[in-house]
Structures are given as C-alpha cells and as structure tokens.
C-alpha cells in the first residue's frame, strides 16, 4: 500500500496557478484581492451593440422600465396587498369606460381620414409625383399616430403600404360608382365616411353606394331598421348576400337539369305505358298526374309570388302598425331625397340593374359605366364578384393584401366592374377583442383568448350557447346574480369536455376550444347583429328571443302530454361530420395481439403446450402497404 497523502500535500503552487487561470477565464473575480479598481465609465462602451429588440412587454415590465428611465425609486409596501381574482382577467370595459370611449369616438371621428392623392396634371413628372405622394402619406401616418397617442384611442390595423393606396386612388379616379362592401352584422365598423368625402372631392358626378353583404343573417325588421337609418343619413344602401345568391343560382341550375331529366323520363314512361297498358288504365292515372303537376305549379307560383312581392305588401299580424308607419314615412323620405333604400335582398340581375341605373351624370368613358368595388378582405368582396360572374374570376382570401393590383372585369358591353385590392382602413374600436370577433384580426394568430371569449359570452345568451353546442354550462352560485352571463372559463370548460379537447394533464384545452367558438362567431353560427345608434342592442336580437321561445314551447308540450320531457338537441356541423362518417374505425396505441400471438411469445391460449416451433413471426405482415400510422397523423384534420 502506498503512503496516504495528507490534506496539505495535494495543494501546491502549481495547482494554485492553474486554478487562478481557470477562474480568470470563467470571469471569476476574487473579493479578497489587494488590487483596488474603480469604474469611471469614461471609455467607449463596446457592449452597447449587444441590444435586444423589445416589441411587447408585460404590464409589470413596462412599468419597471418606465420607472427606470424616469429615475424613480420605489419602496416595497408589504401591508398593502390586493388579491386580483381570475374573473378580473375578462378584458372587457365597464359601462362607464365604454360610454367615455364612445364619446371620444364621436368627438374625433372627423380626424379619421384616408390619405389623399396630391393634385397633379399632365406636366407633373413621375419623380415629383412619387415624392409628393410619399410626403403626404408620411404626414397622414404621423397624424394618426398623434391621434392614437394623445387621445389614448385604439385604431384598427390599417394598410401601411403606399402602393395599395395608389391602387385605391386609381380605382376612384376611373370609377363612376364607388361601392363600399361592408358586413351587415356591423356596418358602421367597416364603413369609412371619409372615403365618401374623398370620392366627392375627386368629382361631384361620382356616386357613392353601400353594399351590405351577408344580409341573409339579418331578419326583415333588422334590415328595415338599417335601411331607415341610412335613409336619414342620406346614404344609398343595398342589401345583398353573395353566398345565398350563389346557392340559389346553383339550385336553379340543378332544378333545370332535374326538370329536363324528368321530362325525358316522363316521355319514356308514357310511350312504355301506351304499349303495355290499356286505355282505361291510362285514363285512371292521368287525373292523379295532372293533380300532382297542378299542385307543383301552384307551389312554384306561390313561392315566386312570395319572393317577388313588393315590400309594401309584406305584412303579418304583429307588423301591421309598423308597416303603416313605414308606409307613411315613405313619401317624406322620397320627397327629401332622390332615392329610397329598400330592405329587400337583391338578386344578381337586380343588383346589376341597380349599378346601371344609379348613375345618371357624365361618365369617365362614353357609353360605359365603371363600378369600383372597395372593401375589407373579410366582408365578401371577392365572393360578390365571383357570384356575379358565376365562376371564380378573383381568388378568395382573408389575408389583407392578397390582391396586388386592381383589375377591370366586363360583365356586359356597357357595364365594367373594377376590383380594388382589399384595404383595411383606419377606424375606432374599443378593445382588441372586438377586432378579433369582427374578423379583422386572424383567429389563428390570437395570443390571448380570454377577452374575445368574454365578449362572446356577453353578446350571446346562455341558452343559445347551450342549445347550439348541446352543452350544460355551470349555473351561478347562490350568492351571485342568477341572470349573469357565463364566464369564459365556464363556457370553454363545458365545450372542451363535450368535444374531448383535452390537454396532456387531463384538463380541457381552453385555447383550442376558444378558436372553434370564435370561428363559429365570425362565420355567423353564433349570430349577433349590431344595431343602429340609439337602439337598444338587447331589443335588436329577435333570433335570441325566438330561440328561447322555441325551447320553452317544447318544454310545455312535453309537460302537458305527461310524457317524460326530452332534451331538445340541435344538430350542428360538428355533430354531422362526426356521426355521419363514411368510414368509422377504432384507433389504438401500443403493441396489440395479432392472431392470438404476442411478439416474442407463442399463442396466448392457456392449457396448450407450445410443442411446435412456429416458422417465422406470424404476427409480422411483410409487404403490407396499409401499415399502422400514428394516431395524431390520422386525426390531423381535427386539429384547430
């Protein structure tokens, strides 16, 4: 055995030097050194280039950074502790804050301007024109930034590329009729009043028009209220639904094809019946056939009459007084203005006739009316063009800036449509949740779902949410208001449990559920229509009242008959896709038994001796193209 080293023998001068060199390389500084240094900060700071870009901060980090810049010191107060509950994260404004914001919006709405094209003529050179356009555009950007900073207002994300605004200027200059396409559920958010002023500034002979798309989501009374409002404001408004009109035109085509096939089959059946049956049987069957054909003709004529009936003749028992008032208001409105806003849903031919008849002054081109279509990307501008042309003339996309250049499309020799790139114009909103629910901001890029879902819970009643999705939302506690709207967590927990959207920890995936709910809200499955000003929003939602009456009526019928009451379920798109699948299969994880064998063992059946050696591996299926795939890849179409 060797001699055991003592504790002091292992540390020498050489080892101490090595340790010091290693510690110096690691940036270690000894505190017990005799060297005295001082940081004067009088040299060049080479570390200043190692900066980190900060685009978004939390409220605490922002507060501390501002305090550090201001040179303020804070002392911790340990006794003043305030607990903020989780329900306070709703992100919605109180009634006082919303009233204050509406007042600010009304006071500063004249400052919401779109950039103007500087005046130019034939003698202006392209270089000078581009420079003046850049200068005016920069001034416009500065004015909006100053408005947002000084008044503490939130503006919608607007187009910041000058080339897109140049396309708008060209469309306005060459158009005789400028049509703003807006969403009928919230027209005032998507309408830009300053655009109408700019059109009149370019030429007095140009005509402004408002096209309310997706108007099939509104009832007749809701459309009538908006028509009266725009009539008082002196705005020419037209109601239209590109999706409903496309479906109607497709149904007409299918109906014509079906009628042609029925006529051919009828002639074949008649010839066959003449050869195979007696004259008596022919006479006995003809009255029934004539009766059925007459009934079908009467039904079709009745439907045509109901569709083509004039608006003044639309009348029900509950609408007689309203129609009388409306009929009395018509002469006054037509006397004061040269047009009358109808609440009817226009068809394709009627819309084209409206485009041709709305302009009566001199046109930019002789014998041709040019209609410029302007609007947000998500309001159905491209769908309107495709419905008019009955084929895909324009690519449809929800991303702003998808169309790079304007294009002219001739519907007929005397009518030309000028498609403008989708522009997001500046407008006021209260919160970012309102922009998400209006479809302005993409849902898939949402970072915080709490404010948006809280707004949905505030707008959509509890019974509508439960009936639409077939869920049971937890009721309020005894110490809470029984009529309060559900919280975001209550809705998303119930929806996640029902759909099976679970996280790895066994909890409902609220973020995934929120995306499904918000997409249903934007598409109109969860319908909420904003009313005109000075109308109560709760009184402007007749679909919610009808939904509640339908549920209560079903409960009364079940209770009066003595039968056990059944839960009224409303089948939605998700249920249809799940329960009506053409190929239903079970998915498993892990290694399974194949033909009674497990890998590396014999038959599983007990009592039989494994006397014969199995040749090869019977559970292996070589050359099987239908191999087992991962479950997450098989169900990737179900991901949000």
Swiss-Prot record:
Keywords: Cytoplasm, Endoplasmic reticulum, GTP-binding, Hydrolase, Nucleotide-binding, Nucleus, Protein transport, Transport. One of its GO terms (biological process) is ribosomal subunit export from nucleus. InterPro entries: G_CP_dom, GNL1-like, GTP-bd, GTP-bd_ortho_bundle_sf, P-loop_NTPase. Residues 251-341, 602-640 are annotated as: Disordered. GO terms for molecular function: GTP binding; GTPase activity. Residues 618-640 have a biased composition (Basic residues). PROSITE patterns: G_CP. In contrast to other GTP-binding proteins, this family is characterized by a circular permutation of the GTPase motifs described by a G4-G1-G3 pattern. PANTHER family: LARGE SUBUNIT GTPASE 1 HOMOLOG, LARGE SUBUNIT GTPASE 1 HOMOLOG-RELATED. This is Large subunit GTPase 1 homolog. It comes from Danio rerio. The lineage of its organism: Eukaryota, Metazoa, Chordata, Craniata, Vertebrata.
């Amino acid at each position: 055995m060797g001699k055991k080293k003592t504790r002091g023998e292992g540390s020498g001068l050489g080892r101490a030097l090595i340790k010091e060199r290693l510690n110096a390389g690691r940036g270690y500084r000894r505190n017990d050194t005799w060297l005295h240094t001082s940081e004067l900060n009088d040299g060049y700071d080479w570390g200043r280039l190692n900066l980190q870009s900060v685009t978004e901060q939390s409220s605490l980090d922002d507060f501390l950074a501002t305090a550090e810049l201001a040179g303020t010191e804070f002392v911790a107060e340990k006794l003043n502790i305030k607990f903020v509950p989780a329900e306070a994260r709703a992100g919605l404004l109180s009634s006082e804050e919303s009233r204050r914001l509406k007042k600010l919006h009304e006071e500063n709405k004249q400052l919401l301007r779109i950039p103007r094209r500087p005046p130019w003529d034939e003698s202006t050179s392209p270089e000078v024109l581009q420079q003046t356009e850049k200068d005016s555009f920069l001034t416009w950007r500065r004015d909006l930034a100053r408005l947002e900073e000084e008044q503490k207002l939130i503006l919608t994300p607007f187009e910041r590329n000058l080339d897109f605004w140049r396309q708008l200027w060209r469309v306005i200059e060459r158009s005789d009729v400028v049509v703003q396409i807006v969403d009928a559920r919230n027209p005032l958010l998507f309408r830009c009043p300053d655009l109408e002023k700019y059109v009149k500034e370019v030429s007095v002979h140009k005509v402004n028009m408002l096209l309310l798309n997706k108007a099939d989501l509104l009832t007749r009374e809701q459309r009538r209220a908006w028509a009266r409002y725009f009539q008082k404001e002196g705005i020419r408004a037209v109601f239209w639904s590109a999706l409903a009109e496309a479906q109607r035109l497709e149904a007409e085509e299918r109906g014509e094809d079906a009628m042609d096939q029925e006529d051919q089959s009828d002639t074949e059946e008649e010839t066959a019946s003449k050869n195979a049956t007696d004259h008596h049987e022919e006479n006995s069957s003809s009255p029934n056939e004539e009766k059925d054909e007459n009934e079908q003709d009467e039904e079709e004529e009745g439907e045509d009459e109901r569709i083509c009936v004039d608006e003044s003749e639309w009348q029900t028992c509950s609408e007689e007084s309203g129609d009388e008032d409306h009929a009395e208001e018509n002469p006054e409105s037509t006397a004061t203005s040269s047009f009358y806003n109808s609440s009817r849903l226009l068809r394709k031919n009627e819309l084209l006739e409206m485009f041709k008849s709305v302009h009566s002054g001199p046109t930019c081109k002789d014998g041709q009316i040019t209609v410029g279509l302007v609007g947000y990307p998500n309001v159905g501008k491209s769908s309107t063009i495709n419905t008019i042309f009955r084929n895909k003339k324009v690519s449809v996309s929800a991303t702003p800036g998808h169309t790079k250049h304007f294009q002219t499309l001739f519907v007929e020799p005397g009518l030309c449509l000028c498609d403008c790139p989708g522009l997001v114009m500046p407008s006021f909103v209260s919160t970012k949740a309102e922009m998400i629910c209006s479809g302005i901001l993409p849902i898939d890029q949402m970072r915080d779902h709490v404010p948006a879902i809280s707004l949905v819970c505030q707008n959509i009643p509890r019974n509508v949410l439960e009936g639409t999705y077939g869920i049971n939302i937890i009721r309020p506690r005894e110490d809470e208001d029984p009529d309060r709207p559900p919280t975001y967590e209550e809705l998303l927990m119930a929806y996640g449990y029902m759909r099976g959207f679970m996280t790895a920890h066994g909890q409902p995936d609220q973020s995934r559920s929120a995306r499904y709910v918000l997409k249903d809200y934007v598409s109109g499955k969860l319908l909420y229509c904003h009313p005109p000003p000075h109308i109560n929003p709760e009184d402007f939602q007749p679909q919610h009242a009808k939904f509640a009456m339908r549920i209560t009526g079903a409960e009364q019928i079940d209770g009066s008959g003595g039968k056990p009451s059944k839960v009224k379920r409303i089948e939605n798109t998700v249920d249809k896709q799940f329960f009506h699948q053409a190929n239903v299969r079970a998915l498993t994880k892990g290694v399974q038994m194949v033909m009674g064998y497990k890998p590396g063992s014999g038959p599983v059946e007990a009592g039989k001796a494994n006397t014969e050696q199995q040749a090869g591996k019977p559970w292996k299926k070589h050359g099987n193209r239908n191999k087992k795939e991962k479950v997450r890849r098989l169900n990737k179409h179900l991901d949000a």
